[in-house]
């Protein structure tokens, strides 16, 4: 491909309760707020990756078919920190040999499925 990759990436999700969402992503996950647009908040997940939440009365209660994957080499550390902060996990850290990943799962207050994962495959591009 002749065209360079995009500069940044933002994934937006809807929420019925922005205040609860803000508390979870700021106080529990510790993400930094980069832009407050009133009914939408955008958080930095990595150097060029962002996660945004917009208040919508019609937001689904438990969205299906979406997994927000947060990639880190320290899955166990994140698991321990979040458990200390009262987070209930759907799946404790484990190796998935089918995809050569190590991961765990939890849900945010909106029912979004979050995966904390590390790639074991040497072909995965590492942090720049």
Short names for language-model regions:
Residues 17-32:
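Amphipathic alpha-helical segments
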